Amino acid sequence: MNRFNFNTVGLFTRDNKATVDFYTKTFGFTTDWDGIQPNVEMTLGDMRIILFPRDAFEQMVSRKFQYPEGFNGTMELAFDVPTFADVDKEYQHALTNGAASVLPPTTEPWGQRTCYVADPDGNLIEIGSFIDK
């Protein structure tokens, strides 16, 4: 048995509602968030993202943080899709739902088709596939 199981990513948001709307519409996450509580849990299959407002977190831990301006180049969320064509399709779907384009779909020398978008808080999201069909 493992000492730890890594199954959740936590994101500190400027606006929980905007972030919930983005992830539910763009990627199909589900949530039973009531729109009032500061803590939001969203799931997609076995993946879980927890959202918490930045200001509420700072109040909880009694300290201020500096957040990246624009795109957050310190981490990414990576989503695999079945085929190269799906990368292109999901990239357009993300843009339609408010994502900012960072890198349009590109086939990399190592054989992956990938693209990058950013969510409303500037977090980088990779959508990629290694299957060219």
Regions found by a protein language model. Give the residues of each.
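Conserved active-site tyrosine of GNAT-family acetyltransferases
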Residues: 19-24, 94, 119-122
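Conserved beta-strand-loop-alpha-helix junction that forms the acyl-donor binding cleft
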Residues: 13-15, 109-110
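Short glycine-/small-residue motifs
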Residues: 124-127
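Conserved glycine-rich acetyl-CoA-binding loop
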Residues: 14, 18, 84-85
